[in-house]
Each structure stands twice: as C-alpha cells, then as structure tokens.
Amino acid sequence: MATAYIETTIPSYYTARNARSILQASRQLATQEWWDGGCSGFDLVTSTETLNEAGEGDPEMAKERLGLLRGIRVLPVTSEAADLARGLVAAGLVPGIAAPDAVHIALASVHKIDFLVTWNFKHIANPHIRERMRAKINDSGYRMPVMCSPEELLNEDEAI
C-alpha cells in the first residue's frame, strides 16, 4: 500500500469553517471528499511537526485538527531529516521563515514516503522549485515524494 504524509494544511482545510472564497471552498470539499473516502486507500503518516502546527491557534479548532490526526502513525524526526531540512533552507529552496515546511519535505523524503499531501503550493508543492528540490534531495541520497493535493489523489469516482 502506498504511503501518504499528511501535512498541516490537510487537517486545517478539513476542519475549517465554510470558506467564502470559491477556491478555498473547493479545497475544503476536495479534502473532505478524499479524507472521508478512505484517503484513497493510502497508509497515512504524519509528524510531530504537523501535530505541533495543528495544535496552534483557536483552541476549539486545534482540538478538531488534532482529533482528525489521532491514530495516524507519527514519523520520528531523525538527524538525517533535520540535516536535509537544513540543507533545503541553506540551498534557498525553502526560506528560513518557512523552515517547518522543509521539515515536512525532509521527513517524507528520508522515511521513503510515496506522497506528501498538501495545499501549500508556496513552499512545498511549488512547481517553480520542484526540480531543483528533487535534485537537492537526490544529491543528499534520498528520493523526493510526489507532492500533491488531495484533489489530485481523488479516485475517478470520487472526483468533485
């Protein structure tokens, strides 16, 4: 079974109040469809980084986000993952202010996860830096996971 790393935007979109923006609302719906549809049969994993981020903000919403993640296997932050995350920041592929995003990418790469599921197209699933990021990760001895949104993972019969 393929593995999928759940990054913070997934529980955030799933549990968010109804959005007024059409784009945000469609992302919420796609996330809910994918999640409620059994996550398309993936073996889900997450990290303490995701749990920490999901626990921030409004206490009631944080409780919902953390509840959604309950029972999902948590990947350990290894020295290899920390080194790779620092390398992604040092190479300018992820800005220092977004270092937690580099941790998500590094954890999924080091732990050989197949997919990193995210709505973060600025620092994680950014097509403008994807190939440079892949090269940096490969040069570090790891394989970059496929970075995609829940919408991209919906089965044909689930597609919205």
Model features per residue range: what roles?
Residues 1-46, 55-66, 72, 90-95, ...:
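Short, well-structured N-terminal submotif of metal-dependent ribonuclease cores
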Residues 71-132, 154, 159:
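Active-site neighborhoods of divalent-metal-dependent phosphate/nucleic-acid chemistry enzymes
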Residues 48, 78, 148-151:
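Residues at the C-termini of beta-strands that transition into short coil/loop
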Residues 125-146:
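C-terminal end-helix/capping segment
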Residues 140-160:
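C-terminal interaction segment
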Residues 8, 48, 119-121:
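Short secondary-structure boundary segments
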Residues 42, 72, 114, 143-145:
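A structural micro-motif
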